[in-house]
């Protein structure tokens, strides 16, 4: 049995498989909060520097603080002082690089919601393992990337392990949305405004005046504005248009049904 001193290096500049990428992530994201930050980030950066020196890649500056600042400016895309898993995927070369593959083909939040609508076939608010497999298969075909059944199974299991935070074998919309680029992830904007089922039912009933069970685009506009005002958050016209377009991707023929909007706005998807 290998002792502590015999552990393999966690960071190197060779090509990585999806599983190896996940191992590196989990090693540095010690508290499992979905980010590398603080001491975790320092440890990650020190390992990265060692790997670069070992492969002959040298930084311009010898000062650790300056190097770290330069590194963060390059890779911390949303400037929050943390590195997210998807940001890390751009730093570490991976053989499959499925996260970048995903982003290439589902680049906007509206496209993401359309894809979600297609694969959440039972409208449960989750994509389960078998639905996720179809999702990834489609993406790989679009990218013209050859794969076999075992490889597809590995991708599916790896993404489940990455994003299935509660380990129930399925991914909720907010979990899956972490695959989106940060600037496109409109669902992050709703994180602090998640509603209970009772709160959601009250606000939906208010805007669904005729009790039809759905609202249209204009009613959604008013509902989103109302939600933002109640939470004392600012939203400009451009943001409103983007959010509305993304949410309306779940609609059928311009009709946004209660269950679909509940997936976006509720703290727990409908059961």
Swiss-Prot record:
Gene Ontology biological process terms from the UniProt entry: intracellular calcium ion homeostasis; regulation of synaptic plasticity; synaptic signaling
**What molecular function terms (GO) are annotated for this protein?**
calcium ion binding involved in regulation of presynaptic cytosolic calcium ion concentration
* Pfam family name, one: EF-hand_1
Question: Residues that bind Ca(2+) 2, according to the entry?
Answer: 76, 78, 80, 82, 87
Phosphotyrosine found at: 214
The residues that hold Ca(2+) 5 are: 208, 210, 212, 214, 219
Q: Where is the EF-hand domain?
A: 16-51, 63-98, 107-142, 151-186, 195-230, 235-270
Describe what happens without this gene. Answer: Mutants show motor coordination deficits.
Tissue-level expression: Widely expressed in central nervous system. Expressed in type I unipolar brush cells of the cerebellum (at protein level).
Compartments where located: Synapse; Cell projection, Dendrite
Q: Which SUPFAM superfamilies match?
A: EF-hand
Give the main localization category.
other
- Binding-site positions, Ca(2+) 3: 120, 122, 124, 126, 131
Residues noted as binding Ca(2+) 1 in the record, renumbered to the chain: 29, 31, 33, 35, 40
What is one cellular component GO term in this UniProt entry?
presynapse
Query: What protein name applies here?
Result: Calretinin
Lineage here is: Eukaryota, Metazoa, Chordata, Craniata, Vertebrata
Q: Which gene encodes it?
A: Calb2
């Amino acid at each position: 049995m290998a002792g502590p001193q015999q552990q393999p290096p966690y960071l190197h500049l060779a090509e990585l498989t999806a599983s190896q990428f996940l191992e590196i992530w989990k090693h540095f994201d010690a508290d499992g909060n979905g980010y590398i930050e603080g001491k975790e980030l320092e440890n990650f950066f020190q390992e990265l520097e060692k790997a670069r020196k070992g492969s002959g890649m040298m930084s311009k500056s010898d000062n650790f603080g300056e190097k770290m600042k330069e590194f963060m400016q390059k890779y911390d895309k949303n400037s929050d002082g943390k590195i997210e898993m998807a940001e890390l995927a751009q730093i570490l070369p991976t053989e499959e690089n499925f996260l970048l593959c995903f982003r290439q083909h589902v680049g906007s939040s509206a496209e993401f919601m359309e894809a979600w609508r297609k694969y959440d076939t039972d409208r449960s608010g989750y994509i389960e393992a078998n639905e996720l497999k179809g999702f990834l298969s489609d993406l790989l075909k679009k990218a013209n990337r050859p794969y076999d059944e075992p490889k597809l199974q590995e991708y599916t299991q790896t993404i489940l392990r990455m994003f299935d935070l509660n380990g129930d074998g399925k991914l909720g919309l907010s979990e899956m949305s972490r695959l989106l680029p940060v600037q496109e992830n409109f669902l992050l904007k709703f994180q602090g405004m998640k509603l209970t089922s009772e709160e959601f039912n009250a606000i939906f009933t208010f805007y669904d005046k005729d009790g039809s069970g759905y609202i249209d685009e204009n009613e959604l506009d008013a509902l989103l504005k109302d939600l933002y005002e109640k939470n004392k958050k600012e939203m400009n016209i451009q943001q409103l248009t983007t959010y509305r377009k993304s949410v309306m991707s779940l609609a059928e023929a311009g009709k946004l049904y209660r269950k679909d909007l509940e997936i976006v706005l509720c703290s727990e998807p409908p059961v």
